[in-house]
Regions:
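Conserved N-terminal diphosphate/IPP-binding helix and adjacent helical/loop segment
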Residues: 1-56, 61, 65-66, 70-92, ...
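All-alpha helical catalytic cores of prenyl diphosphate-utilizing isoprenoid enzymes
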Residues: 3-6, 20-28, 104-112, 119-224
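Short alpha-helical scaffolding segments that buttress acidic/His motifs in well-ordered protein cores
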Residues: 16-17, 35, 53-56, 135-142, ...
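Residue-level signal for inorganic ion chemistry
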Residues: 31, 114, 145, 247, ...
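C-terminal helix-coil-helix/basic helical segment that borders enzyme active sites and/or dimer interfaces
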Residues: 38-40, 46, 189-198, 221-229, ...
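Alpha-helical scaffolds flanking conserved acidic
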Residues: 42-59, 100, 128-135, 199-210, ...
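Divalent-cation-assisted or electrostatically stabilized phosphate/pyrophosphate-binding catalytic cores
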Residues: 76-107, 157-178, 201, 205, ...
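Short hairpin/turn module used for nucleic-acid contact or packing/dimerization
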Residues: 277-332
């Protein structure tokens, strides 16, 4: 895209795009690639599959740009978030507004480039057609899941009962993360590899269960993670008022004082480190962290069980088992 950026004079967008795709875990492309191998074995020419899988990282970058803007996050992977990077280009009182506007456009451009990269990856027209519905569903699910996450943080979802809040958190967990991060990428690769229905079903179960465990690990890191490892300030989920499964478990398990204290801290501007320590102590004391750790372990075990008995390539199976560990046993 360098030539287009030069012709339009929008080289700052290309520079920011490079920064957005630097680092990261590359898990979604990995699940896509090994989903294909599970169905069809290693491709003779891996280039088209690798390009198609890599396009998922451009999609992910586009969503992270918008996610950081929605959350007001200053950093991503230890560097300034996209809107802060753009903001630094313009001195004066309108810098923040420019940064926000430019970040919206950068996210849109990355989304477009992701689609272009997939379509021009060199896959056969038949393969592109087979995969189109999986990719379209994946995009829609993550965007609607993101809306639910934002709505819950702002109090625009049903909070009338603990069950209603838990239902919203479960939907966010499934659609914003589990399907988007693991299930759909694995199904996309398997669909490209012409997987039979039985294998697609096994990968779907594996993907949803493992994706839940992946997000629960993120939720724990969002409260207890080391900023040096995560690249984001500790306690951001508390600052942003995220009512994750972890937080809702603490609210449900806590006594009246613990519940009211934690509830009052969620989404409150200007939280101090002492406030965040209080929130962490409540989450620990109520057993919420241990409960989520147990749920991660159980979901991961169930995900691996879903692969048993499924007819798939041995190397693909082994890689999917390895990826399960990488997705859940991590510090970033």
């Amino acid at each position: 895209q360098a030539g287009l950026a030069d012709r339009t004079g929008a080289t700052a967008v290309l520079d920011a795009a490079h920064a957005c795709v630097a680092g990261g875990k590359r898990l979604r492309p990995a699940f896509c690639y090994w989903g294909y191998v599970a169905a069809a074995g290693r491709p003779i020419d891996p280039g088209p599959l690798l390009r198609a899988a890599a396009s998922l990282d451009l999609l992910h970058a586009s969503l992270l740009v918008h996610d950081d803007l929605l959350d007001g996050s200053d950093t991503r992977r230890g560097a300034p978030s996209a809107h802060r990077r753009f903001e630094a280009l313009l001195p004066g009182p309108r810098a923040a507004r420019f940064g926000e506007a430019a970040a919206i456009l950068l996210g849109d451009v990355l989304f477009s480039w992701s689609a272009e990269m997939f379509e021009n990856a060199g896959l056969s027209p038949e393969a592109v057609r087979r995969a189109a519905s999986v990719l379209a569903t994946m995009r829609s699910e993550v965007l609607l899941g993101q809306y639910l996450d934002v709505a819950a943080a702002f109090g625009a979802t049903d909070r009338s009962t603990p069950r209603a809040q838990a239902d919203t958190a479960e939907k966010v967990l499934e659609f914003k993360s589990a399907r988007y991060s693991v299930r759909r990428p694995a199904e996309l690769g398997a669909t490209l590899g012409e997987a039979p229905p039985g294998l697609l079903a096994a990968l779907g179960t594996y993907g949803s269960l493992l994706g839940r465990a992946f997000q629960l690990r993120d939720d724990i890191l969002g409260v207890f993670g080391d900023p040096e490892a995560t690249g984001k300030p500790a306690g951001d989920d508390i600052r942003e008022g995220k009512r994750t499964v972890l937080v809702l478990t603490a609210l449900e398990n806590g006594d009246a004082r613990q519940h009211d204290t934690l509830d009052s801290l969620l989404g409150t501007p200007g939280l101090t480190e002492e406030d965040l320590t209080t929130a962490r102590e409540i989450i620990e004391a109520t057993g919420a962290r241990n409960s989520c750790e147990e749920l991660i372990a159980r979901s991961t075990t169930d995900a691996l069980t879903a692969l048993e008995g499924a007819d798939m390539d041995a190397e693909g199976r082994s890689a999917l088992i390895t990826l399960a560990g990488l997705a859940t046993d991590r510090d970033r």
